[in-house]
């Protein structure tokens, strides 16, 4: 689960991390009132969406008068903001963050992520703040410094100080940087975050360490322990199809292809997408119906997939272990009839009640294309999507 920048900063402040003063706003008038409340002569008007690259897309503006605050708030609220992370369709901006301006002397990067290789939280830091960290990793990897944090000891003073010096924190600001990194780690650990990024972390003109931005992702499997974080969820920022799928315990992720996939098991689902790509096709989604899918769940899965107008064909790939092939066959037929299926449908199933499932499909009277293995299924669905 993702949250907005202003929500991430609320979490950081609870752990002693310094951030600019600011207020979330949902209207132009609220934005002006927030600037008046903050005082000063410079404010930053920031679009709040779940994507990076907002500044380059025109979603972050520096205002030097209340009139400019009003103008920029009016421009940004309601705009469709397109960044390298939103895709060409962009995101509709429905909320803003109005912050006090900052005197920036140096921009740094600090992030944390769960590292599967070391089975620890990895702290990553760079002197190249304000840039896309993937770009830095590709072109100047020597500028990224890492610490793999021992969960029993936490981030040690010596580790934090060493990282701070490597990324160019002024010597007099090292204690602040240490406190920041240890606060960030504590926030990461106690909220069950899967990713935290501060980009940029700045050194101000008077050598203060301030988190100018904040990005948090959380482990969805741990949200039951954090109702206060669940309350931060913004459904407007999520794919409606993924929200609908979650209501039926379906794991659904939208992709940009034209072949719908309905599979049981995450591993088989990924293998199915790989084989589709191998045969020249492009999957439109990842959809795992799980091991205990019912006819109702399969029907709902079809409905969700077919809301995507780009889908030209559907592949159902089922291994009947806990999931029986005859149940899937009944669900496929019910779904095809209920949604008035108009795109080609390829079904490959193997395992428990396989022959019964195939018999049910054959006797359904529907134009279902069957396949005996994954390669055959992928080839048939790719050809069908291409109108062959």
UniProtKB/Swiss-Prot annotation:
Mg(2+) binds at residues 199, 213. The lineage of its organism: Bacteria, Pseudomonadati, Pseudomonadota, Betaproteobacteria, Burkholderiales. This is Succinate--CoA ligase [ADP-forming] subunit beta. Binds 1 Mg(2+) ion per subunit. Succinyl-CoA synthetase functions in the citric acid cycle (TCA), coupling the hydrolysis of succinyl-CoA to the synthesis of either ATP or GTP and thus represents the only step of substrate-level phosphorylation in the TCA. The beta subunit provides nucleotide specificity of the enzyme and binds the substrate succinate, while the binding sites for coenzyme A and phosphate are found in the alpha subunit. It holds the Pfam family ATP-grasp_2. Heterotetramer of two alpha and two beta subunits. ATP binds at residues 46, 53-55, 99, 102, 107. The gene is sucC. It comes from Herminiimonas arsenicoxydans. Gene3D superfamilies: ATP-grasp fold, A domain, ATP-grasp fold, B domain, Succinyl-CoA synthetase domains.
